[in-house]
A protein has these predicted regions:
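Hard-cation-handling environments
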Residues: 1-80
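Patatin-like phospholipase A catalytic core
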Residues: 82-84
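Thiamine diphosphate
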Residues: 67-71, 94-177
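Conserved small/polar residues in nucleotide/adenosyl-binding loops
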Residues: 178-183
Length: 191
């Protein structure tokens, strides 16, 4: 299905956007994403990560990158914005910082705490570990984002140098789009 970009055309994109969020709602979302699913027994490092998130959410510890990132997704989902995240090892996070998906060490069942927020808001959450084919995955996600302006689409290179494998997509689609009108002419992208 092709998305109609007309409502987004000829807009002034420099207007102020209010990104404040109600602190009480923020704490509720933080509680959801830092709670270990009922009946789950996690590996010790993952249990500690969730305990640390609870401390951050309660103001007992400084917020780190992993908590800030997962809370950004939580607030977007809560406000009805869909989120799609792909890349090799994104469910766990390359440096074990994300753990958007956790596994029960007893039976291997998986749980995604953010999904509870998405379900409550009736919006989409998609988090996929991808194969190690950066060019194909970034190309697909770039195309996906071009048809889904209301959602957040992220491709994460597992390590910075892994983006090298997707350099053709970066050069011929993404950078070209922002450096000239050639992308419009070459690829019929009207952003």
């Amino acid at each position: 299905m092709w998305f109609d970009w007309n409502p987004y055309m000829n807009q002034e994109w420099w207007d102020f956007a209010d990104t404040t969020f109600n602190p009480k709602e923020f704490a509720k979302l933080g509680s959801i994403i830092s709670s270990i699913p009922e009946g789950f027994e996690l590996q010790k490092p993952v249990t500690k990560l969730f305990e640390d998130r609870q401390k951050m959410n309660n103001g007992e510890a400084k917020i780190n990158w992993g908590f800030a990132e997962i809370m950004a997704y939580a607030t977007l989902l809560h406000e009805g914005y869909p989120v799609r995240l792909t890349g090799q090892d994104v469910r766990r996070g390359t440096f074990s910082h994300r753990h958007a998906v956790v596994h029960n060490k007893i039976d291997g069942n998986a749980e995604m705490p953010l999904l509870q927020i998405a379900d409550q808001s009736k919006t989409n959450l998609e988090i996929y570990d991808s194969l190690l084919s950066e060019e194909a995955v970034l190309g697909f996600e770039y195309g996906y984002s071009a048809t889904w302006p209301s959602g957040l689409v992220i491709w994460e290179a597992q390590f910075g140098d892994f983006a090298n494998g997707a350099q053709v997509v970066i050069d011929q689609f993404i950078c070209l789009l922002y450096t000239s009108d050639a992308a419009d002419e070459s690829w019929s992208v009207y952003l």
